[in-house]
From Swiss-Prot:
It comes from Arabidopsis thaliana (Mouse-ear cress). It comes from the Eukaryota. GO terms for cellular component: nucleus. It is found in: Nucleus. GO terms for molecular function: DNA binding; DNA-binding transcription factor activity; transcription cis-regulatory region binding. This is AP2-like ethylene-responsive transcription factor ANT. Residues 34-56, 199-231 are annotated as: Disordered.
Length: 555
């Protein structure tokens, strides 16, 4: 068998790396001189230290071999403590391989350990167990399974370069306190906890390599070690599980994934609940839930509309906001029946809308959409039933606004006392900026579209209405007097129409007679006024319309 102690310095370094023990400087000098003398030292680690190390089992070799080197309380074999001495032959070579080649039977007792005479070749059969002292290597046992290639497998383990690299890596892992318990064990790639063979040889130590350990003490140490090994194994399993859980949680947080449940290597991602706040879906067709207000809105897609400059055909028609989902669904049904007829798909049966179908026959699509909006329970931007109208949060008055007209910003139209006035202001602005296709709160036939489009300013609701040519007189008495003037001079012609009065009149003048100016009024009257009542009539009929301030400012 090849000796592990060669004269080459490289072999010395490899041997120390393989077996995991260190040689002092004096020892290396002795090896360099070619000497075969060795000074041994006992291990400074106590039994408590060795029992605190982690031991499960490290099986070395291929799958066909049952050979194993164990550190623990396995009755079949194992290493129970660090070797405090290296057995040498008479020529100075290691005899570890020769000791490992020996095999024992399955019923071999723990007290039949190798003796000193076995290593020095002076063993006698009549030597008593009490007289012979156990070597500190007495805890080295052999596997009960006898295989002819045991020596070869073990020798390949110490000579295989990948195994040496693995041993070096495990020693590096042993320095990490987070992976080891007290720094006394390492985690191997085989899934087992293994302990490297750490042997120390010090030149200053004496040759007291023989210890007087007895069988009773060995049994106690074995029981104590097995209990510690079981506790440490359970703690390591919990630590590894916690480490995996923390790693998975950190990975999920980094990727921003939802909570997952691991079931047999499969990840099941939970979907969001249907009742969660903020969703925009509904069980009814054409109904969405507003993510901010929580109110339900009804929309209809009009695919018959084609806007210039847009490749997509159609537009979304807003039908109003509702506090209940069923109301929004019914609004969609009515609009769909108006647009597409009774053959369209509705949320509820068309038989429930017989009365509404008769009413919508006299309205256009835009008129009926405006009718549905006015019946809604409120828009998303305020509590008004009219489009573009909101209520001021401080003084409670109604404000009118229109969006996406002045540089894609909201245009403030003013503050009004009633919702209707604010709604009219919105309608006028919508017609002014969007033409005849504008969606208005009231029927578009209510307004003079040509006049609104030709005006340079936004007209008020009164001026924007159709048939608004009469003078508004707020005083009832003045209105009665004006009617009397018109009726009194309706059958008389004006002799000199070129001399009509053209001064602006704010109010109508009452009928003039002689009683108003006295008895001498008729004689002193100017000759060019033959019929003052007729002239007053002409004045009243030819009064120019007073200019009305069309723009309104914020109050």
């Amino acid at each position: 068998m090849k000796s592990f102690c060669d004269n080459d310095d490289n072999n010395h370094s490899n041997t120390t790396n393989l077996l995991g023990f260190s040689l002092s400087s004096n020892m290396m000098k002795m090896g360099g001189r070619g000497g075969r003398e060795a000074i041994y030292s006992s291990s400074t680690s106590s039994a408590a230290t060795s029992s605190s190390s982690v031991p499960p089992q490290l099986v070395v070799g291929d799958n066909t071999s049952n050979f194993g080197v164990c550190y623990g309380s396995n009755p079949n074999g194992g290493i129970y403590s660090h070797m405090s001495v290296m057995p040498l032959r008479s020529d100075g070579s290691l005899c570890l391989m020769e000791a490992l080649n020996r095999s024992s039977h399955s019923n071999h007792h723990q007290d039949s350990s190798p003796k000193v005479e076995d290593f020095f070749g002076t063993h006698h059969n009549n030597t008593s167990h009490k007289e012979a002292m156990d070597l500190s290597l007495d805890s080295l046992f052999y596997n009960t399974t006898h295989e002819p290639n045991t020596t070869t497998n073990f020798q390949e383990f110490f000579s295989f370069p990948q195994t040496r690299n693995h041993e070096e890596e495990t020693r590096n892992y042993g320095n990490d306190p987070s992976l080891t318990h007290g720094g006394s064990f390492n985690v191997g790639v085989y899934g087992e906890f293994q302990q490297s063979l750490s042997l120390s040889m010090s030149p200053g130590s004496q040759s007291s390599c023989i210890t007087g350990s007895h069988h009773h003490q060995q049994n106690q140490n074995q029981n104590h070690q097995s209990q510690n090994h079981q506790q440490i194994s359970e703690a390591l399993v919990e630590t590894s599980v916690g480490f995996e859980t923390t790693t998975m949680a950190a990975a999920k947080k980094k990727r921003g994934q939802e909570d997952v449940v691991v079931v047999g290597q499969k990840q099941i991602v939970h979907r969001k609940s249907i009742d969660t706040f903020g969703q925009r879906t509904s069980q009814y067709r054409g109904v969405t839930r507003h993510r901010w207000t929580g109110r339900y809105e009804a929309h209809l897609w009009d695919n018959s509309f084609k806007k210039e400059g847009h490749s997509r055909k159609g537009r979304q028609v807003y039908l109003g906001g509702y506090d209940m989902e069923e109301k929004a669904a019914r609004a969609y049904d009515l609009a769909a029946l108006k647009y597409w007829g009774p053959s369209t798909h509705t949320n509820f049966s068309a038989e429930n809308y017989q009365k509404e179908i008769e009413d919508m026959k006299n309205m256009t699509r835009q008129e009926y959409v405006a009718h549905l909006r006015r019946k809604s329970s409120g828009f998303s931007r305020g509590a008004s039933i009219y489009r573009g109208v909101t209520r001021h949060h401080q003084h409670g008055r109604w404000q009118a606004r229109i969006g996406r007209v002045a540089g894609n910003k909201d245009l403030y139209l003013g503050t009004f006392g009633t919702q209707e006035e604010a709604a009219e202001a919105y309608d006028v602005a919508a017609i002014k900026f969007r033409g005849t296709n504008a969606v208005t709160n009231f029927d578009i036939t209510r307004y003079d579209v040509d006049r609104i489009m030709s005006s340079n300013t936004l007209l008020s609701g009164e001026l924007a209405r159709r048939n608004n040519n009469s003078i508004v007189v707020r005083n009832t008495e003045d209105q009665t007097a004006l009617n009397a003037v018109v009726e009194g001079g309706s059958n008389k012609e004006v002799s000199t129409p070129e001399r009509l009065l053209s001064f602006p009149a704010i109010f109508a003048l009452p009928q003039v007679n002689q009683k108003m100016f006295g008895s001498n009024m008729g004689g002193n009257m100017s000759p060019w006024t033959s019929n003052p009542n007729a002239e007053l009539k002409t004045v009243a009929l030819t009064l120019p319309q007073m200019p009305v301030f069309a723009a309104w400012a914020d109050s």
